[in-house]
Amino acid sequence: MTVVHIGYKYGQNNTGGAAIAATRLHKTLLARGIESHYVCVWQCEDGKNVHVLPRIGSVARQLYFFATRGLRGFWKFTRWRKSIPLNIIPMFGLEKLLNKIRPDVVHVHWINADVIGFNQLANIKCKVVVNLHDLFMINIIEPYPGIDQRYIHGVTSENSSFLERWLFKRKLRLVHKLNPVFIGPSKWVCDCARKSIIGNSCRAYAIPNIIDCAFRYKPEMRLQHDKFIILFGAYAGRRNPSKGFVDLEKALSMLPEKIKDKSELWIFGEEANDCRTRGVKTKFLGNVSSPSNLATLYNQADVFAFPSVQETQGMTKIEAMLCGLPVIAFDRTACAEGIENGVTGWVVNAGDVKAFAVGLIKQYDEVFSSCPSDEMRWKIAKRAKTMFGEYEILNRILEVYRA
């Protein structure tokens, strides 16, 4: 079997969740002895069978960026005030490469930044799998619809602009012609696909993203400390609005002063000077590129704060649990999937920051109880390994490829 992945970036260092997940899948397939190729616009680390298109240094690459960035950026100067991908421009050189590789499956990952033209994608002759890292393929413009239900009920001249109707119809034609299989990393995102007008005729399988085997619980990595370590991390850290740091701030403000004094907030994914957040000492760890270094942080922390507003899975949540770290999350989109409330962490109602603070207090009490135990952390790690083990997930993906 030969598989070709298509995505915007390749690599695991500060590239975003979709690129990290796709890179790990590519590497895992290669390790299993399956011929896997990765086609991307930007290669951010060395890798086997990675193809950068349009070719670096070529005139075609310059034209590609001029056209895609120009078309996407034009909308910033209109009433939309933001970039809007149109996916009109083809990825130069893709047809020639696919004819040479002759894949059995093309696995489409994150193409939101005009990576590939929809017409070009529709003409791929082999089986196509689309990974729902977000809802870009089945929504109108935004990667997450929020409260907008038009992706379920449809667009009309009364509820949508010409641009929205045009984009929606292009995606509808693409999916109907391509008839892809959807893989979503959570039940929530697959349910969204099944309910959507664009994706309701396609099969959708809920299969988690593959997580690096470096993430596992190691008691010897636990540091002896007299602080309560709250870990938070995301691409761009606090500045990423979808990760919900504002809600975490509110929850921290509700902690008793005694707990604030004995707590530290560690933030990875952002470079900044150390400070205090609502009375809690805050330490910035920058971009953590190595999975083993990130696993060390998970093992050293006492709780992982996961206040995300919208997620199709939330890889940091799973990485934390594989390292035996309890997670506190809001029950919104797929943020809480995989957490067993009161056993492997705490799930609180969407936006209930007071309950989020209570979860932090409960874990604080557990850590500083008279007889703290590793039993909970072992239980979390074991359960996460059962749910998110690399071998089991890869086998499920291969079943989809072969079906």
In which residue ranges do the predicted regions lie?
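A charged, aromatic-enriched C-terminal amphipathic alpha-helix characteristic of glycosyltransferases
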Residues: 371-401
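Aromatic "clamp/platform" in nucleotide-sugar-dependent glycosyltransferases that forms part
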Residues: 309
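Short alpha-helical donor nucleotide-sugar binding micro-motif in glycosyltransferases
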Residues: 296-301
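Short hydrophobic beta-strand element within catalytic cores of glycosyltransferases
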Residues: 326-329, 339
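Conserved donor-binding/catalytic core segment of Leloir-type glycosyltransferases
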Residues: 222-243, 249-252
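Conserved acidic donor-binding segment of nucleotide-sugar-dependent glycosyltransferases
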Residues: 341-342, 346-353, 362-368
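Membrane-proximal helix-turn-helix segments that form the acceptor-binding/catalytic region
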Residues: 96, 136, 148-182, 195-200
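Nucleotide-activated donor-binding/catalytic signature segment of Leloir-type glycosyltransferases, i.e.
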Residues: 269-292
